[in-house]
Amino acid sequence: EEIHFNWQGGEPTLLGLGFFRSVVKIQQQHVPPGKRITNALQTNGTLLTDAWCDFLRKNNFLVGISIDGPAELHDAYRLDKRSRPTHNRTEQGLKLLNKHGVEHNVLAVVNRRNGERPLEVYRYCKRQGVKFIQFIPLVEQLGSTGQAVSSTHLASGGQSPIDLVTKCSVRPRQFGNFLIAIFDEWLRHDVSRVFVQLFDETLAAWGGQSPSLCIFQKHCGRCLAFEHNGDLYSCDHFVEPEYKLGNIHQ
């Protein structure tokens, strides 16, 4: 009964508030009978203002804030184009969301640095008053120049997958230990008070329920991904030339 739009990037707020006002207007004009449209926005929060938050609240946007823990950990990799730290601006965005009553959650990318300090990351998120938390692993493939490249192919030429990812990528066992440490604390203190997506989805699948997160489902393809130029993919985990389904302008 619902049609979900998930606005991601890059940084979707760079499109401007006027763009999203137009989006909502078009959605209202074309929503099919009996359906309801929902919008979610994933942002680093640095461009949020009172005007942005007023719009997001009035139009029932769910906002995900990308923040990787305390400043020391967050700013290790999240610098702006001028190589300036962004943590203070992201925190200010969180405060604005709270001020305006915008529904929001936090997404923390687990990397080689903060992957060693799981409880610091988890407790930091809780201190921000956040009740819903996502953790996703940073896994970037090395290109021939030694720089990160976008690709889904992490094994080639007989090399170990570890040799094919950037130094800032979280290691498999490290990510596992990160989740275990947080799970133990969550189980002791925070069940029904804090919701960690990965734990909820895993427990739902274990209990025989159908998970809502696509990576836990039996079949892929329920969440289409559109690029800014109209290119269409069956999943945002496979936005690669060989997986392109077509273009909506063709």
Which residues fall in each region the model found?
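Conserved glycine-rich "GG(E/T)P / GGGxP" loop and the immediately following alpha-helix
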Residues: 1-137
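Radical SAM enzyme [4Fe-4S]-AdoMet core and its adjacent flexible, acidic
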Residues: 76-88, 95, 99-219, 225-229, ...
